[in-house]
């Protein structure tokens, strides 16, 4: 089974705690996202911090053609 985009972001940051620290949220929030999904307001910060695209994190909000910013 392939890792989810959030799992890839956690791996890129090192740990869930490290990702939480990068985003200024609690580790519990990151854990919560595993079952509930990444909040819209966190997709771009996660992309900037880890390189996991906003499209992968929230394809409902960021269609593939919007992935590359100018």
Residues covered by each model-derived region:
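Residue-level detection of the helix-turn-helix DNA-binding "recognition helix"
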Residues: 35-36
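Short, charged recognition helix plus adjacent turn
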Residues: 1-9, 13, 17, 21, ...
């Amino acid at each position: 089974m392939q890792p989810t985009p959030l799992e890839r972001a956690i791996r890129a940051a090192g740990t869930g705690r490290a990702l939480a620290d990068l985003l200024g949220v609690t580790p519990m929030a990151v854990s919560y996202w595993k079952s509930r999904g990444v909040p819209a307001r966190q997709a771009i910060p996660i992309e900037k911090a880890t390189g996991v695209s906003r499209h992968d994190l929230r394809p409902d909000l960021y269609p593939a053609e919007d992935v590359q910013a100018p």
